Amino acid sequence: MFVLVNLKAYPCDPVAIAEAAADVAETTPATIAVAPQPADIGRVADTGATTYAQHVSPTEHGSHTGSVLAESVADNGAVGTLLNHSEHRRRLADIDGSVAAAERAGLDTVVCANNPAQVAAAAALGPDAVAVEPPALIGTGTPVSQADPDIVSDAVAAAEAVDPSVDVYCGAGITTGEDVVSAGDLGASGVLLASGVAKADDPRAALADLVAPL
């Protein structure tokens, strides 16, 4: 099971959360990754935690002011990146370019999608994984595996029909170990979450609870 904690732009301590993630990851067969703000990637990677970017741009070296260069992300210690999160939606052509940029830099890719149809389109771009996240459930604490389990199983089937090598994750409302187990039961091989850890009073305890049943 792959657990990706997106810190978004929350006012949290990314290094402390990364240290907790690295420690908890040693107690479980699950992989726990942390996606901090771009400026924090190096510090987070230095903790030994599996580190992802929140986005990379579909650009190469050159005159691209404001772009997040995949090579820079990799040089600072990230091993993967999110793409097309619901809060940072991109056009399909740009997602394709970002997947290519990430692959060029040796980064794993997780492309987010809102529904099974978008999952199929994302899978056709050849990422390492796609993640289905209904926007209405993001940050609610109500897990997608409980509120709309069919969207997870349908997303798994949609990706399988396009490219069986693409992993399927689910997100939105994931906060407990039970949520993670339910996602796996529906066919997902990973989960995305944010506020359940980034806004927790005790992020280490929240992480431990997430992976305890695994």
From Swiss-Prot:
A GO-annotated cellular component: cytosol
Function: Involved in the gluconeogenesis. Catalyzes stereospecifically the conversion of dihydroxyacetone phosphate (DHAP) to D-glyceraldehyde-3-phosphate (G3P).
Keywords recorded for this protein, A-Z: Cytoplasm, Gluconeogenesis, Glycolysis, Isomerase
Family affiliation: Belongs to the triosephosphate isomerase family.
CDD domains: TIM (cd00311)
Main location: cytoplasm
SUPFAM superfamilies: Triosephosphate isomerase (TIM)
Pathway field: Carbohydrate biosynthesis; gluconeogenesis; Carbohydrate degradation; glycolysis; D-glyceraldehyde 3-phosphate from glycerone phosphate: step 1/1
EC number per UniProt: 5.3.1.1
GO-annotated molecular function: triose-phosphate isomerase activity
The protein's name in its UniProt record: Triosephosphate isomerase
Keyword Cytoplasm among record annotations: yes
Record lineage: Archaea, Methanobacteriati, Methanobacteriota, Stenosarchaea group, Halobacteria
Protein's cellular compartments: Cytoplasm
Binding-site positions, substrate: 6-8, 138, 173, 194-195
Assembly notes: Homotetramer; dimer of dimers.
GO biological process: gluconeogenesis; glyceraldehyde-3-phosphate biosynthetic process; glycerol catabolic process; glycolytic process
